[in-house]
Structures are given as structure tokens and as C-alpha cells.
Amino acid sequence: MTTNYIFVTGGVVSSLGKGIAAASLAAILEARGLKVTMMKLDPYINVDPGTMSPTQHGEVFVTEDGAETDLDLGHYERFIRTKMTKRNNFTAGRVYADVLRKERRGDYLGATIQVIPHITNAIKERVISGAEGHDIAIVEVGGTVGDIESLPFMEAIRQLAVELGRERAMFMHLTLVPYLGAAGELKTKPTQHSVKELLSIGIQPDILVCRSDRVIPANERKKIALFCNVQEKAVISMKDVDSIYKIPQLIKAQGTDDLVCQRFGITAPEADLSEWEQVIYEEANPTGDVVIGMVGKYIELPDAYKSVNEALKHAGLKNRLNVTIKYVDSQDVESKGTEILEGLDAILVPGGFGDRGVEGKILAAQYARENKVPYLGICLGMQVALIEYARNVANMEGAHSSEFSKDTKFPVVGLITEWIDSEGNVEERTEKSDLGGTMRLGSQLCHLAKGSKARELYGNATVEERHRHRYEVNNNLLPQLEKAGLKVSGLSADKKLVEIIEIPNHPWFVAAQFHPEFTSTPRDGHPLFEGFVKAAGESVRGELEK
């Protein structure tokens, strides 16, 4: 299969939405029957984002095969059906580490290792490898044109485009066209300078996607086309919209997919966007409102919980409910008390690391349990629910996780020292293991108990969900918890690790060790989130059995 490539770059400012624009184009091409994949090239020196602060980088998205990747891969999976893998995201740090490892082995036979050709060749090899087996690969380069960090990546895609030829490679560049209120007009000069910067490194864009807070009129598009050396029909106006799921239609309406197919000589049927039309309809026509309290420690940057945010919205679509997320700092719960949780229709405690704010999360779980508020715990959110139950129901005074308290008498959560990974290999860890890449990662099989809420929601005896954690329920103390009424409704493939817990005498209290948010999409939703938001809606209407 011959693969064609679309390289996506950004200019003027960061956070323009390259990932969303690229994923939207991919969604249209997929809707035309083409096999599409996406890649994200990150210029930072970290080997992967796994150990980066969520408040700086945003969430870490985990793929089926256990790669810790950029949050843009979450956008990719929410827009297209193709599942991402470790081949779909790599960093400058990963490339340099691989090249240096080869140099130490003597693979380069004594050559002087340089950015060109060794680093650029390594980048090209990874891009080609990740694109195999697809009609089109859309490759997004992180950062902004002109950044020194991204130069090796820009050079690599320039070389690759030359090697592939014009019939197999094209460039799409995102820029900002700001509106100056004082002058009362849109300004195209930043876009012109951005393209000039791109030209200086040998790249001529074929499509310009121009971000603005309003539709860019034809005369301004004509001006941009003239000064940036692109066809007028290839200047795409991408105005701000109230939902990212409207962007595929916005791009399709301007013929962007036709430009791609014409360039690559592809004959494909017209895109069927009926699924996206349904998503937009559901989003625009809710029948009620719910307020979900998200009690976390990284709330100053909502992108730290990007997939959770989106999964709640998806569940809202499926239930025809408008979901408002109220972010609650878990440290505020510690200092101000659970009064700040009053008025919430449901409570969600997401994953996290470290002991800062953990007692606030425990209090949130207690509040939800005692006041019969629907509760969904994810990863650490399950662990704090377990700790709270142990302390206040199972009479295990001072119960805690060994992550936060080494000398607790009841370590109901402890370090996993051995487990089977997604490929069936036995993994072992100790307290001295490196932090990066040493967690239980990727898709794992889970057995669901008969008669459980989890099994009712999923409708299956087994499911596969993605994990990212190094602490688990202590099986030695599990009998005492179960005797006190806790229900274990999900177990790992070998039935040795607890994956889901429930409280039977509560209207809706479910917590999972895995991350269900990573597999939720706007078209399909996710059973746990759908059930959770449904319970919140029933709570609002007074229909929830207390």
C-alpha cells in the first residue's frame, strides 16, 4: 500500500488547535472510506510526557499498547476510528536516546554523529514506520514555526517531502488572523510572516488554515493566497465555534478534503458525516442540565483532565443532558470542608499522583457515600474511595495507601510488585524502580462479576480498559473490606488484581482502577460515564433511589 503524507505545522502563536484541525481533516478523509492514521512529533527533550507535570503539559494519554503520549493522541482517537500506538507519538528526547544508544553500540562505525543526517534520518524512519499500512498519514509537528527546538523535525519533514515527491506529500499550515477592534479589520500580516518563516526552511505550504474569531471574507483570503503563494481555494477560514465537533463540517464545507484527494490522485466517495451531524444535534438539543463536581489537584489547567472532560460531555450527549463541570480543588475540601460539595448532582474523583490534596479526595468520597450522591472514581479516585470505606465503615482506623503513609497499620493500597502486561509478559517493580515508563500501562482484560452494576452497564462478562498506575488494592486486607459490604465487581485477567469496586447499598457508587476516559468518543460514548451522568440526571429529577 502506498501511503500519502500530510504534514501539519503551526505559526504565529501556540495553542492554535493544530491537533483538532488535523483530526477533523482525518475524520472527513476517513468518512470518504480512506484508511487514515495520525502522528504527533514533539520537539521537547523528555523521552515521553509520562513524568511531566500535568499543570505544564496537560494530561498523559495512554494508548492500547501502553505508550504514555501527548494529549493530542486523545483528540485523534476521538475523531477517527484508528487506534493510536507507541508509533504514533515520539519526542526529540526519544530520537536522541535511540541515536545515542546506537552510537554506543558502534552501529555508526565511528562516524561523527550530527543532527543532519543522523537525527533527521531517525525522525524520517519513525514517521515512515508509523504510517505503514494506511492510505494517508497526517503528521503533526508540535510547537510553532521558528522555535529552535523544532528545527530538526522541520528539516526531516522537508527532506521526506522531497524524497516522496509532490504526488505523495503536502503541507498544511495553521496560522492566526487576528481582528483588531481599534482598526475594525482582520490583519493578515502575521500569517504572511509565518509563511515567510516556513519558506526560509524550505517548506511551501499547500493549504493554509487561518484561525480567527470570525469568518475571513473572500477579499482577505485572496490577499493571503497572493502573498503566501497558495491557491485561493486552499486558504481555509476556521472561525471560532462553540464545539470542536463542528470543525469537520466546517472544513468539509470549504472543500479541504477535495484538495487532498486531488493532490494525491485519490478517487473516493463523498464523505458521509451523518454520525457527526448526530453528535452536533445531540449537543445542541439537551433535555436537561447536570452539574458534575470534579475533585482534583490539577484543576488550574483543565487540560490536565482533558479526556475526562470530554468523556463527561460524550455521556451528556448520550443522555441528552448538558453537563457542566465544576472544578473543585481537593485541598480546598481539606481546608474548607465538604460544604463546598453541596449542590452537586454527582462527584467524580480522577487520577493523580502524590499526597497533596489526597485527604480532600478521601473526604469527597465520604461525602458522596454518606449523602447518596452518584460517585465515579478513576484510578486514585478508586483508591481514595477504598481508603475512606476502610476507615469509616470497615473499622480500619488510620487505613491508607503505602504511597502516602509507609507506617499505616492498614495499607489497603500498596505497590504492585508483579503483574502481567498487555502482551502477556510478567512485569516486576520495586520501590527503587525508575518513575518513567514503569507503571502498569495499556489495555488489560477485566472480568466483571455477575449481578454487578459494572456488568449491567457494559453488558459483557469481560472488557478491556487502559491502565496507568503502580499501586493496587492490597488483597490481604480485602476480606475485611468485603465483610463490611464492599463489592469487588471487576478483576484482572489472572483475577489477582482488583479493577472495579462498588457499594451495593448506594444508588450509584462505582470506582475503577483503570482509565475509562481514554476509550470514550463523541460517537460511541462509554458505559461507565453514560451510567454516571444518567444517575446525575436522575438525581436532579428526584428519580434516583436513595
Swiss-Prot record:
GO terms for cellular component: cytosol. L-glutamine binds at G352, L380, G381, M382, Q383, E403, R470. It comes from Aliivibrio fischeri (strain MJ11) (Vibrio fischeri). UTP binds at S14, K187, T188, K189, P190, T191, Q192, K223. ATP binds at S15, L16, G17, K18, G19, I20, D72, K239, D240, V241. HAMAP family: PyrG. Catalyzes the ATP-dependent amination of UTP to CTP with either L-glutamine or ammonia as the source of nitrogen. Regulates intracellular CTP levels through interactions with the four ribonucleotide triphosphates. Allosterically activated by GTP, when glutamine is the substrate; GTP has no effect on the reaction when ammonia is the substrate. The allosteric effector GTP functions by stabilizing the protein conformation that binds the tetrahedral intermediate(s) formed during glutamine hydrolysis. Inhibited by the product CTP, via allosteric rather than competitive inhibition. Homotetramer. This is CTP synthase. It catalyses: UTP + L-glutamine + ATP + H2O = CTP + L-glutamate + ADP + phosphate + 2 H(+); L-glutamine + H2O = L-glutamate + NH4(+); UTP + NH4(+) + ATP = CTP + ADP + phosphate + 2 H(+). Keywords: ATP-binding, Glutamine amidotransferase, Ligase, Magnesium, Metal-binding, Nucleotide-binding, Pyrimidine biosynthesis. One of its GO terms (biological process) is pyrimidine nucleobase biosynthetic process. GO terms for molecular function: ATP binding; CTP synthase activity; glutaminase activity; identical protein binding; metal ion binding. Its EC number is 6.3.4.2. InterPro entries: Class_I_gatase-like, CTP_synthase, CTP_synthase_N, GATASE, GATase1_CTP_Synthase, P-loop_NTPase.
